[in-house]
Regions:
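Short, structured coil segments at secondary-structure junctions
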Residues: 28, 71, 129-130
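Acidic, PIN/NYN-like endoribonuclease modules and their adjacent C-terminal/linker elements
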Residues: 1, 108-140
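Active-site phosphate/pyrophosphate-handling residues
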Residues: 7, 20, 84, 105-106, ...
Length: 140
């Protein structure tokens, strides 16, 4: 299981995604790639604040396809186990003077509860959370 951060999905939605991200994803077993409900919320929020128009409509269709088809059955909720991990991660980061954004902490907590790594461009945001990190922008 690998949990992809919101920025990985956002990259794939760009008109010209970074080839390294596409290549990294193509090397993964699709059934082992997961998303969190937090990332779903971030994607949907980003679309909701976009101006109405063709671009927004096209991106909404693409995101709906990803969520309903590509990631069907592989969107992880923020549950009680994640809530326990959240408390540990947030307190630990605060104790060392590195507070973490709520959404990042929720994603990290879901990954921690599942023993899964997070694939993200923003690895510093997730350091010190007790999870493994993968950066598809510079993965071998």
């Amino acid at each position: 299981m690998i949990i992809v951060d919101t920025n990985v999905v956002s990259e794939l939605l760009r008109p010209e995604p970074e080839p390294c991200v596409e290549q990294w994803l193509s090397r993964q077993d699709g059934q082992t790639v997961y998303l969190t409900a937090i990332s779903e919320a971030e994607l949907r929020h980003g679309l909701a604040i976009m101006p109405a128009g063709k671009r927004r409509t096209a991106l909404m269709d693409a995101v709906d396809h990803i969520l309903r088809e590509d990631m069907a059955g592989r969107i992880l909720p923020f549950d009680s186990a994640a809530a326990q991990s959240y408390a540990i991660i947030a307190a630990g980061r605060r104790a060392v003077g590195r507070p973490i954004m709520q959404a990042d902490c929720q994603i990290a907590a879901i990954a921690h509860a599942h023993g899964a790594p997070v694939a993200t461009r923003n690895t510093p945001d997730f350091e010190g959370c007790g999870i493994d990190l993968i950066n598809p922008w510079n993965a071998e």
